[in-house]
């Protein structure tokens, strides 16, 4: 009977749809007049229920009677269990073509109704890279696209360090292309992504709007990677159709795979995100404050920034209540100036150099020290991510990581000069924070 049902269903489904959605579709069991179908993942389950439920129901009723029913189940993936079963292994060093932020993982991604579908798609793609290809992920600003995309890259590297993952923004791609053209290294640039990359993740694709030369280069890169069966992830703040001035052939490439949307989160979703962030940072912020934050901000990125600002205050003073939180976040007479923005001015005073010099590429001793110590302080005391530290200091991610590492080494060696500088910064920052909270 199982084979009969599948054969009857196959006759009613086009070849293209069958090969796209039904290759892992099986009859798990038949109980009385109820058929349980099984598929490989929740993504396929959702698609089958949305697009083919009427056809499946018709075949089941024709085979078992008018009162016959069916359901579709999927094999769940348990990342934790799988990692435990593998046990401790000696890992090779990942072969990163471009850096990933190790803080972006599936485990610390807060899942709600607004992003559950996107989360499940990326989780499944991590198990079968290249199976859903390309994946075009879009949403409003600050809803978790970058987190999901990098979580996929980190997961793949964790399970196969030999993979070569390339993560970059479209602006990075464009700048690297122009640099290659200027320096006569175009072939090396093309080989880096077309031949060496196993996974290509392009973030903020909308920044290539109107840049025809970069679009052409990306088109050929896309084709080379896709034809090799390697995974491509495209992230955008809009749908492919809304990418105005993009060449139609590029848009058609984006549409040939999965279009995945992250919806707008509810207040309940934002509250969960706030709780998760404070937990991950190891700082307890009471529910009353988090509830307030989730009522005034409408996306996870703003929630994250608000939580970090309050954590910085709590680390400095040891206490935090709703009144103080409201003052820090919504002072109407004096917009709160983030500590990280003030940090450059503090460094300028302590190291006797201008803010412009700190943000420049100059490497004189006092400027270099100001930059290194400032990056360390921003990351360790103000809880900024290395990516955000890079934005504050106008430096690349790799440069930030290197400078922080150098300061950590000096501290471990007992360098008194560095420790004194950190104390001065700490004192100045506390004075500034006190002024902001009044």
Swiss-Prot record:
Residues 1-68 are annotated as: Domain I, interacts with DnaA modulators. The keyword Methyltransferase does not apply. Residues 68-98 are annotated as: Domain II. GO terms for cellular component: cytoplasm; plasma membrane. GO terms for biological process: DNA replication initiation; regulation of DNA replication. InterPro entries: AAA+_ATPase (IPR003593), Chromosome_initiator_DnaA (IPR001957), Chromosome_initiator_DnaA-like (IPR020591), DnaA_C (IPR013159), DnaA_dom (IPR013317), DnaA_N_dom (IPR024633), DnaA_N_sf (IPR038454), P-loop_NTPase (IPR027417). GO terms for molecular function: ATP binding; ATP hydrolysis activity; DNA replication origin binding; lipid binding. The keyword rRNA-binding does not apply. Residues 315-438 are annotated as: Domain IV, binds dsDNA. It is found in: Cytoplasm. Its main location: cytoplasm. Domain I is involved in oligomerization and binding regulators, domain II is flexibile and of varying length in different bacteria, domain III forms the AAA+ region, while domain IV binds dsDNA. This is Chromosomal replication initiator protein DnaA.
């Amino acid at each position: 009977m199982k084979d009969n049902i599948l054969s009857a269903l196959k006759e009613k489904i086009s070849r293209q749809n069958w090969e796209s959605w039904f290759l892992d579709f099986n009859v798990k069991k038949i109980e009385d007049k109820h058929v349980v179908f099984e598929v490989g993942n929740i993504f396929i389950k959702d698609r089958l229920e949305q697009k083919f439920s009427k056809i499946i129901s018709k075949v089941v009723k024709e085979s078992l009677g008018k009162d016959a029913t069916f359901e579709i189940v999927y094999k769940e993936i348990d990342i934790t269990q799988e990692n435990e079963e593998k046990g401790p292994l000696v890992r090779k060093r990942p072969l990163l073509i471009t850096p990933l932020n190790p803080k972006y993982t599936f485990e610390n991604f807060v899942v709600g109704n607004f992003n559950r579908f996107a989360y499940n798609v990326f989780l499944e793609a991590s198990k079968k890279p290249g199976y859903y290809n390309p994946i075009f992920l879009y949403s409003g600003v600050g809803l978790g696209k970058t987190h999901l995309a990098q979580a996929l890259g980190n997961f793949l590297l964790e399970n196969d360090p030999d993979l070569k993952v390339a993560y970059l923004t479209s602006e990075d791609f464009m700048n690297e292309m122009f640099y290659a053209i200027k320096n006569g290294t175009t072939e090396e640039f093309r080989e880096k992504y077309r031949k060496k990359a196993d996974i290509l993740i392009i973030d903020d694709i909308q920044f290539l709007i109107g840049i025809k030369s970069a679009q052409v280069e990306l088109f050929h890169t896309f084709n080379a990677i896709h034809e090799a069966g390697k995974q491509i992830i495209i992230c955008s703040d809009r749908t492919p159709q809304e990418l105005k001035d993009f060449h139609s052939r590029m848009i058609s490439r984006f549409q040939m795979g999965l279009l995945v949307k992250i919806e707008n989160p509810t207040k309940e979703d934002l509250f969960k995100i706030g709780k998760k962030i404070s937990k991950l940072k190891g700082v307890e912020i009471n529910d009353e404050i988090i509830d307030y934050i989730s009522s005034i901000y409408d996306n996870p990125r703003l929630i994250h920034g608000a939580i970090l600002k309050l954590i910085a205050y709590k680390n400095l003073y040891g206490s935090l209540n709703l009144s103080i939180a409201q003052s820090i976040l919504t002072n109407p007479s004096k917009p709160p100036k983030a500590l990280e923005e003030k940090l450059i001015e503090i460094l300028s005073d302590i190291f006797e150099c201008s803010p412009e010099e700190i943000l420049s590429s100059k490497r004189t001793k006092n400027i270099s020290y100001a930059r290194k110590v400032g990056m360390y302080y921003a990351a360790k005391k103000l809880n900024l991510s290395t990516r955000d530290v890079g934005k504050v200091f106008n430096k690349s991610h790799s440069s930030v990581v290197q400078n922080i590492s150098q300061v950590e080494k000096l501290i471990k060696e007992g360098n008194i000069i560095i420790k004194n500088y950190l104390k001065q910064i700490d004192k100045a920052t506390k004075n500034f924070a006190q002024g902001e909270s009044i």
